[in-house]
Protein backbone atom coordinates (compact mmCIF):
# COMPACT_ATOMS: atom_id res chain seq x y z
CA UNK A 1 0.00 0.00 0.00
CA UNK A 2 0.87 3.65 0.30
CA UNK A 3 2.71 3.18 3.61
CA UNK A 4 5.01 0.63 2.02
CA UNK A 5 5.59 2.81 -1.04
CA UNK A 6 6.49 5.81 1.14
CA UNK A 7 8.77 3.84 3.46
CA UNK A 8 10.65 2.32 0.55
CA UNK A 9 11.12 5.68 -1.19
CA UNK A 10 11.92 7.77 1.88
CA UNK A 11 13.57 5.38 4.33
CA UNK A 12 14.96 2.38 2.49
CA UNK A 13 16.18 4.06 -0.72
CA UNK A 14 17.20 7.42 0.74
CA UNK A 15 17.57 6.97 4.51
CA UNK A 16 15.76 10.28 5.13
CA UNK A 17 12.97 9.46 7.57
CA UNK A 18 12.42 7.66 10.83
CA UNK A 19 8.88 6.78 9.85
CA UNK A 20 6.38 7.45 7.07
CA UNK A 21 2.69 6.64 6.88
CA UNK A 22 -0.54 7.64 5.22
CA UNK A 23 -3.91 7.77 6.95
CA UNK A 24 -7.54 8.12 5.94
CA UNK A 25 -10.16 9.44 8.35
CA UNK A 26 -13.83 9.39 7.38
CA UNK A 27 -16.39 11.82 8.74
CA UNK A 28 -20.12 12.07 8.05
CA UNK A 29 -19.75 14.61 5.24
CA UNK A 30 -16.11 14.44 4.17
CA UNK A 31 -12.82 12.62 4.69
CA UNK A 32 -9.23 13.57 5.28
CA UNK A 33 -6.25 11.83 3.81
CA UNK A 34 -2.78 12.59 5.14
CA UNK A 35 0.84 11.63 4.79
CA UNK A 36 3.07 11.86 7.83
CA UNK A 37 6.83 11.48 7.98
CA UNK A 38 9.41 12.29 10.61
CA UNK A 39 12.80 13.52 9.43
CA UNK A 40 15.64 15.89 10.28
CA UNK A 41 14.80 19.53 9.46
CA UNK A 42 17.40 19.71 6.70
CA UNK A 43 15.67 16.84 4.85
CA UNK A 44 12.13 18.26 4.76
CA UNK A 45 12.27 19.69 1.23
CA UNK A 46 13.90 16.58 -0.21
CA UNK A 47 11.28 14.37 1.47
CA UNK A 48 8.46 16.53 0.14
CA UNK A 49 9.88 16.22 -3.39
CA UNK A 50 10.10 12.44 -3.07
CA UNK A 51 6.52 12.20 -1.75
CA UNK A 52 5.32 14.36 -4.66
CA UNK A 53 7.20 12.11 -7.08
CA UNK A 54 5.50 9.01 -5.63
CA UNK A 55 2.06 10.63 -5.90
CA UNK A 56 2.80 11.71 -9.47
CA UNK A 57 3.72 8.14 -10.41
CA UNK A 58 0.32 6.94 -9.22
CA UNK A 59 -1.39 9.71 -11.20
CA UNK A 60 0.58 9.21 -14.42
CA UNK A 61 0.23 5.48 -14.97
CA UNK A 62 -1.88 2.65 -13.57
CA UNK A 63 -0.32 0.08 -11.29
CA UNK A 64 0.88 -3.04 -13.08
CA UNK A 65 -1.11 -6.21 -12.44
CA UNK A 66 1.44 -7.71 -10.03
CA UNK A 67 1.52 -4.63 -7.78
CA UNK A 68 -2.25 -4.11 -8.03
CA UNK A 69 -3.05 -7.74 -7.13
CA UNK A 70 -0.55 -7.70 -4.24
CA UNK A 71 -2.20 -4.55 -2.88
CA UNK A 72 -5.67 -6.13 -3.14
CA UNK A 73 -4.43 -9.25 -1.36
CA UNK A 74 -2.96 -7.10 1.41
CA UNK A 75 -6.18 -5.10 1.82
CA UNK A 76 -8.28 -8.27 1.99
CA UNK A 77 -5.93 -9.70 4.61
CA UNK A 78 -6.09 -6.53 6.68
CA UNK A 79 -9.90 -6.56 6.52
CA UNK A 80 -9.95 -10.18 7.65
CA UNK A 81 -7.63 -9.49 10.58
CA UNK A 82 -9.63 -6.38 11.55
CA UNK A 83 -12.82 -8.45 11.64
CA UNK A 84 -11.19 -10.82 14.14
CA UNK A 85 -11.04 -7.95 16.66
CA UNK A 86 -14.72 -7.88 17.62
CA UNK A 87 -14.58 -4.60 19.55
CA UNK A 88 -12.86 -2.78 16.70
CA UNK A 89 -15.20 -4.41 14.17
CA UNK A 90 -18.26 -3.28 16.16
CA UNK A 91 -16.93 0.28 16.36
CA UNK A 92 -16.13 0.35 12.63
CA UNK A 93 -19.58 -1.01 11.82
CA UNK A 94 -21.25 1.62 14.00
CA UNK A 95 -19.17 4.39 12.39
CA UNK A 96 -20.09 3.18 8.91
CA UNK A 97 -23.76 3.14 9.83
CA UNK A 98 -23.49 6.62 11.36
CA UNK A 99 -21.71 8.04 8.30
CA UNK A 100 -23.59 6.28 5.50
CA UNK A 101 -26.88 5.09 7.07
CA UNK A 102 -26.13 1.54 5.99
CA UNK A 103 -23.96 -1.40 6.89
CA UNK A 104 -21.98 -3.50 4.46
CA UNK A 105 -20.40 -6.72 5.60
CA UNK A 106 -17.03 -8.11 4.64
CA UNK A 107 -18.54 -9.94 1.66
CA UNK A 108 -19.94 -6.67 0.29
CA UNK A 109 -16.58 -4.99 0.74
CA UNK A 110 -14.84 -7.82 -1.12
CA UNK A 111 -17.42 -7.51 -3.91
CA UNK A 112 -16.57 -3.81 -4.27
CA UNK A 113 -12.86 -4.64 -4.32
CA UNK A 114 -13.46 -7.05 -7.24
CA UNK A 115 -14.87 -4.12 -9.22
CA UNK A 116 -11.71 -2.07 -8.70
CA UNK A 117 -9.23 -1.88 -11.60
CA UNK A 118 -5.79 -0.29 -11.97
CA UNK A 119 -7.29 2.31 -14.34
CA UNK A 120 -10.06 3.23 -11.90
CA UNK A 121 -7.51 3.53 -9.11
CA UNK A 122 -5.43 5.82 -11.33
CA UNK A 123 -8.45 8.06 -11.99
CA UNK A 124 -9.07 8.38 -8.25
CA UNK A 125 -5.37 9.14 -7.70
CA UNK A 126 -5.57 11.93 -10.28
CA UNK A 127 -8.40 13.51 -8.34
CA UNK A 128 -7.08 13.06 -4.80
CA UNK A 129 -3.36 13.64 -5.37
CA UNK A 130 -3.68 16.77 -7.51
CA UNK A 131 -1.26 19.27 -5.94
CA UNK A 132 -3.84 22.06 -6.22
CA UNK A 133 -6.08 20.31 -3.71
CA UNK A 134 -3.42 19.39 -1.16
CA UNK A 135 -2.14 21.32 1.83
CA UNK A 136 1.13 20.93 3.69
CA UNK A 137 1.61 21.36 7.42
CA UNK A 138 5.16 21.21 8.76
CA UNK A 139 5.96 20.94 12.48
CA UNK A 140 9.51 21.93 13.35
Identify the residue ranges that each predicted region occupies.
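Short Ser/Thr-interspersed hydrophobic loop/turn segments at strand-loop and sheet-helix junctions
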Residues: 2-3
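M16 family metallopeptidases and their MPP-like homologs
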Residues: 7-60, 65-116, 131-140
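Low-complexity, intrinsically disordered Gly/Pro/Thr-rich segments
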Residues: 117-126
Amino acid sequence: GMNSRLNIALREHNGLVYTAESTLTNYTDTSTWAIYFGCDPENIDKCLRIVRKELDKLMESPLNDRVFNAALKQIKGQIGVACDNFESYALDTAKAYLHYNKFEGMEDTFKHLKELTPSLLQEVAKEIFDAKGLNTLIFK
